[in-house]
């Protein structure tokens, strides 16, 4: 069973995450940030990862700490659930439209975190959430999930559609990457024999 539970507690946030990579896309998400909840629900539904996230943070200041720490906690849980990463496909990509917006995401579950973010917004906020925080979430997730992550929005006008296409594309790419390859179920997908470290 590729499941994990992570609890993260600081002076700024308290977060508990449970996930199952081999789920059916069931979710229970409560971060105190409505738009972030909506995006995490998309990740669960479209990756088929079962996900429970409960977070309390200093949202009376702003949403930065809760957004970033939620990304860190989910990424850490993914790393734990993947274990030694034997048998995974490792790579995944998705090109996802949402109405007028089109976004491409490519991932490598290499255990070498890196983010390329080619996404621009025409507004500073979506609802009460600063649009700059979406990059912060992806950065935090990539760091603790050990994923090389490229996110490129090709075009779009509606900022909600742009962001949602990013999260949905991430979900689809992750679903491909962490699927088990039945021909190599006991092998690490690297000529080095391990995933991580330097090239």
Curated annotation (Swiss-Prot):
<dbReference type="GO" id="GO:0005737">
    <property type="term" value="C:cytoplasm"/>
</dbReference>
<dbReference type="Pfam" id="PF00475">
    <property type="entry name" value="IGPD"/>
</dbReference>
<protein>
    <recommendedName>
        <fullName>Imidazoleglycerol-phosphate dehydratase</fullName>
        <ecNumber>4.2.1.19</ecNumber>
    </recommendedName>
</protein>
<dbReference type="InterPro" id="IPR038494">
    <property type="entry name" value="IGPD_sf"/>
</dbReference>
<keyword id="KW-0028">Amino-acid biosynthesis</keyword>
<comment type="similarity">
    <text>Belongs to the imidazoleglycerol-phosphate dehydratase family.</text>
</comment>
<comment type="pathway">
    <text>Amino-acid biosynthesis; L-histidine biosynthesis; L-histidine from 5-phospho-alpha-D-ribose 1-diphosphate: step 6/9.</text>
</comment>
<keyword id="KW-0963">Cytoplasm</keyword>
<dbReference type="InterPro" id="IPR020568">
    <property type="entry name" value="Ribosomal_Su5_D2-typ_SF"/>
</dbReference>
<keyword id="KW-0456">Lyase</keyword>
<dbReference type="GO" id="GO:0004424">
    <property type="term" value="F:imidazoleglycerol-phosphate dehydratase activity"/>
</dbReference>
<keyword id="KW-0368">Histidine biosynthesis</keyword>
<dbReference type="InterPro" id="IPR000807">
    <property type="entry name" value="ImidazoleglycerolP_deHydtase"/>
</dbReference>
<dbReference type="GO" id="GO:0000105">
    <property type="term" value="P:L-histidine biosynthetic process"/>
</dbReference>
<dbReference type="InterPro" id="IPR020565">
    <property type="entry name" value="ImidazoleglycerP_deHydtase_CS"/>
</dbReference>
């Amino acid at each position: 069973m590729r499941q994990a539970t992570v609890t993260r507690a600081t002076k700024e946030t308290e977060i508990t995450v449970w996930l199952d990579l081999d789920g059916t896309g069931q979710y229970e998400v409560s971060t105190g940030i409505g738009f972030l909840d909506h995006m995490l629900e998309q990740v669960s539904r479209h990756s088929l990862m079962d996900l429970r996230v409960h977070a309390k943070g200093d949202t009376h200041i702003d949403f930065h700490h809760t957004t970033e720490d939620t990304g860190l906690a989910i990424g850490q849980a993914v790393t734990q659930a993947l274990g030694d990463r034997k048998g995974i496909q490792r790579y995944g990509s998705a090109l996802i439209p949402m109405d007028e917006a089109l976004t491409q995401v490519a991932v490598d579950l290499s255990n070498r975190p890196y983010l390329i973010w080619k996404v621009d917004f025409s507004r500073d906020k979506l609802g009460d959430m600063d649009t700059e925080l979406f990059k912060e979430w992806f950065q935090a997730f990539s760091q603790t999930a050990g994923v090389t992550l490229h996110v490129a929005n090709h075009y779009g006008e509606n900022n909600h559609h742009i962001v949602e296409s990013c999260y949905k594309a991430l979900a689809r790419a992750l679903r491909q990457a962490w699927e088990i390859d039945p021909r190599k179920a006991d092998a690490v997908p690297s000529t080095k024999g391990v995933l991580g470290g330097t090239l």
